[in-house]
Amino acid sequence: MALISQRFATREKLILVGLYLSKYDRLGLQRLGFGSFTEAFNVIGYAMGSRPASIKNYRDEFDPLFPNRRKGWHKRPLRRYCLKVFEEYKSLDLESFAGLVKSFFGYDENAWSEVQEKEDEEESESQFAKRLITGLTAEQYFQSIHHNLSEFEGYSLENTTRLGCGYDFRLRKNPGGDFLAVEVKGLKERTGNLSLTPKEHQLATALRDRFFLFVVKNFQESPFHEIFSNPLSGRLQFKKRETLTVHISWLTRV
């Protein structure tokens, strides 16, 4: 079955994630690299621009249909639009269903599996969750609450994550005026390590008080955030780390 994620509306994606988590339970969590349902609800919910509780509710809705330990919403019939999704996708095997869920976030399961060694499979599973936490999920979290933050009150928001400019968001009060740059990082736990790329470090040095490091922590339980203005001159202590990378290519003459 060819599954193209672009044809799904957001609500249908949420329903499908709920169905996946209900059907495959903890095996499904492991296949996506999550350690708990709470972590999966938080990470996927925010990444989709929705509430974590929405995914939990859809999982609970499907629970009476599967032999897991949860009772779910067993006292009411399945809603019509959920039943429609269930009937269409209930037969998906674990690999296909996990690949579909990953495709919602731009992860091409089939392309990667062609070159992936078996011993890398476990690492690949954990990398999916890690990349969501450190990337899209943290960015969507920031977008969902930035208008409530006093530091950015009255500023318009521009998403620059695809521009490669050394920060994730640009905020301005007036068109053409000075802007604030916000680099967003995400952590699974309450504490952890994070790094700045050379470009991010360069921009933080140049912009000083106009550069903000926004760190979302504890996605495994209950996310919260910390904001660091001019992070290179505050209480954070950065240590330079140099890594030698070997690039290999194959050349020919025609």
How should each PLM-predicted stretch be described?
Residues 26-45:
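Short, charged amphipathic recognition helices of the HTH superfamily
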Residues 142, 146, 167-171, 180-188:
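Conserved catalytic cores of phosphodiester-cleaving nucleases, focusing on short active-site segments
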Residues 75-132:
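Interdomain/boundary linker segments immediately adjacent to catalytic/signaling cores
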Residues 156-172:
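Beta-rich nucleic-acid/ligand-interaction surfaces
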